[in-house]
C-alpha cells in the first residue's frame, strides 16, 4: 500500500488521536501491521487506557504485532479515572512487555492527585507533566517547583520554543480524514 512506501525512511509512527482510539480493534490491527514492517523501529499511540488491555493485546498479537516495537503514551485525566485504576492499567502493559509512559496536564488544583499518581505508577513508567494551555495566567513559583518535583523536565513546558521544521525532514502528519502531509 501507499503507507509502506511513504513511511520507509521514518522508522516510527505515533498515533495521537482526537478522542480515544484504542477502544477500536482496527487501531490495534493497524498498529500490528505497522510493527511488522522491517523499516519500523517503533509504533505507538496516545490513550487514556479506557480499554481492556488483555483483549486488545490479544488482537495485536493475533495480527502478528511485534510487542517489542509497541509504545503507549498513557494520558491521565483525573475526571475520568482514579489513580489506582490508571496505575494498574500501566502495570498490566509493563507486565506484558509493552513500553509505556504517562502524561498529565499540569492543572494546579490537581497537584496532590498528580503527586499520588507519581508515587503509585509502577517502576519503569515515567510521568510527564504538560503545561496547561487554558490556565490564563503564569504558574506561581510554588506551582512550578511542585510540578518540577513530579516531572524534572517540566521546565521545558514553561519555555516552549517554536518548532524547527528543518530538524524534522521527511516527517509525515496524518490528518483525521486519512490525508498525509509533510
Predicted regions and their residues:
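Radical SAM enzyme [4Fe-4S]-AdoMet core and its adjacent flexible, acidic
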Residues: 67, 71-181
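Short, flexible, glycine/charge-rich loop motifs used to bind or transfer phosphoryl groups or to couple energy/partner
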Residues: 3-4, 62-63, 161-163
Amino acid at each position: 500500500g501507499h503507507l509502506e512506501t511513504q513511511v520507509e525512511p521514518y522508522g516510527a509512527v505515533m498515533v495521537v488521536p482526537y478522542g480515544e482510539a484504542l477502544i477500536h480493534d482496527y487501531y490495534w490491527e493497524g498498529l500490528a501491521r505497522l510493527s511488522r514492517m522491517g523499516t519500523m523501529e517503533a509504533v505507538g499511540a496516545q490513550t487514556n487506557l479506557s480499554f481492556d488491555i488483555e483483549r486488545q493485546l490479544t488482537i495485536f498479537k493475533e495480527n502478528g504485532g511485534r510487542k517489542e516495537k509497541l509504545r503507549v503514551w498513557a494520558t491521565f485525566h483525573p475526571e475520568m479515572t482514579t489513580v489506582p485504576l490508571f496505575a494498574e492499567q500501566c502495570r498490566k502493559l509493563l507486565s506484558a512487555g509493552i513500553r509505556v509512559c504517562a502524561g498529565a496536564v499540569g492543572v494546579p488544583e490537581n497537584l496532590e492527585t498528580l503527586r499520588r499518581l507519581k508515587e503509585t505508577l509502577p517502576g519503569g513508567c515515567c510521568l510527564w507533566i504538560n503545561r496547561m494551555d487554558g490556565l490564563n495566567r503564569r504558574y506561581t513559583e510554588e506551582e512550578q517547583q511542585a510540578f518540577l518535583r513530579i516531572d524534572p523536565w517540566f521546565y521545558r513546558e514553561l519555555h516552549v520554543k517554536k518548532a524547527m521544521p528543518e530538524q524534522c525532514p521527511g516527517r509525515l502528519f496524518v490528518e483525521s480524514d486519512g490525508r498525509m502531509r509533510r
